[in-house]
Amino acid sequence: MRAIGLILAGGNTYRMKDLSQKRAIAAMPVAGNYRAIDFALSNMTNSRITKVGVVTQFNAGSLHEHLSSSKWWDFGRKQGGLHVFTPSVTSDNSLWFRGTADSIYQNLSFLKESHEPYVVIASGDGIYKMDYNDLLEFHVDKGADISLVCSELSDPKDCERFGMIKLNDEMQVVDFEEKPIAAKSNLVSCGIYVIRRRLLIELIEKCAEEERFDFVRDIIIRYMNVKKICGYKIKTYWSNIASVEDYYRTNMDFLKKDVRDFFFREYPDIYTKVDDLPPAKYNVGSDVRNSLVASGTIINGIVEGSILFKKVFVGSNCTIKNSIILNDVYIGDNTYIENCIVESGGTILANSYHKGEDGPKVIIEKSDRYVF
């Protein structure tokens, strides 16, 4: 493809609450075996983009570990490959990234040393599958300076959490509102852009000169009436992880057959780092219905409408309903869990009762484990 990729994965949000204490949002576990960033990385390699930069910052340890080998996404190359950028103190700079535009500016050499004419920019917290070649073809056909991907928002109340755009008949962006109370349209910006590399360098350098740091506010919105910015609609599944409720809802969507088939049965595939773990084990007395169960898990109880990630142990006479159990969780006997998200590495003592009443309840239990 005639483009390089740039994934912005350094953000933090208070709406993730306790779930963001261990990891960046881009490293949040999804659908049993995956991380959020896997979807953007897979889209890049499936679109034949062979050179990708990932910008990280907040709580990036888990994300860096996940990206430690680029072979899983076919980026183990002599030319191109996967490049991970973190804030670093230099003679010219002693600050962390102050925004998305600033994070690109502090790694501008990645763009200047590349030769591809276009750049595809994507967020690391979007759950979707698309061919960026279609976006690039649309961008060229429209003669646009910048093209962004948009999707229809099913619930109008969600507009307060996203950037909402309005298009004219020529698919040009005529209005962009950042997190409005009442949106003028139902089109949400997905945080995916294509732009000519030289133009991006020019705009980013101008932002730096004027001490402007945000890509959306200081480039997309500011230049909306100066540059030709077009919107490319996608009609397939798209979700963004920006809150505990988003995270819960997105994972639960994977219990729907059409969503699972779209991501995991239809070409192309979604790739992730593979752990060598044994298959899940269902002991006598277990009963599992409409759930996703990852490798290394042992189940002795009842699991219904839930997602269990890797290395989860469910004790005898346990009931787990409509819940998400993250990696390496031990659940003691006679435990009831419903409408909850159990943080990784947790130990739920026997005879416990947890139920989320108003939305999903986040459980962080750090009791001692005894292995005999």
State the predicted function of each range.
Residues 1-254, 364-365:
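Unchanged
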Residues 1-4, 198, 206-372:
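Left-handed beta-helix
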